[in-house]
Amino acid sequence: MGSIGSAYERELRSVLAGEIKGVRAVTKSCSEIERTQAMKVTNRPFLVVRAPGSGSEGTGDLLALRGDICFPIEVKSSKSKKLYLSGRTFDQLEALRDVGNRCGLLPLYAYRLKGVRGDSWRIMKVEVKGLSGKLRHLSRSIPSLPLTRNGKEYLDWDKGMPLHRFLSLVCRSDGAGTSVDSFPSSPITVSYTHLRAHETSLHLVC
């Protein structure tokens, strides 16, 4: 990917590692809600390792680890919303899938669209078999790489999960894979709802 690609790898690595400066940099043109969701990673950061071989052996460009969660991540960037995989890039995809199947990992693609305001990163998963635990639950909420009319996987920025939503998903305190769309809008709403439920149960007991 060259020096530009390496810069984007460092950008994503800084975010996943929970560095406040890095999160602020990628969310400076995002909404306050999006920024708040992304900032959750500062409380539950990943250990992020730059993988050797630039993803050619199924490790991806980055390896993000935390507890029982591990993501090999292949980083791509382009000025185009769609990126088709062929030759070496298709071999990288197949290697990621093979490692995911053999090791029970969930490989991801992180796609950076150049020249766009707001959240410029999108996350997509590589379809693998045999996932268990938290990875299996998380996998249900992360979109897969879309398919061409010939059934071949490719990258489509519009069909990926925004990075801030991904961070909010994987940084939930319980680690469950509930969709980000189902998150409560605010802590106050949750407290009020729980309080009303508690009051109702007391009335029923009485």
Predicted regions and their residues:
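Domain-level recognition of nuclease-like catalytic cores that cleave nucleotide substrates
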Residues: 3, 101, 106-175
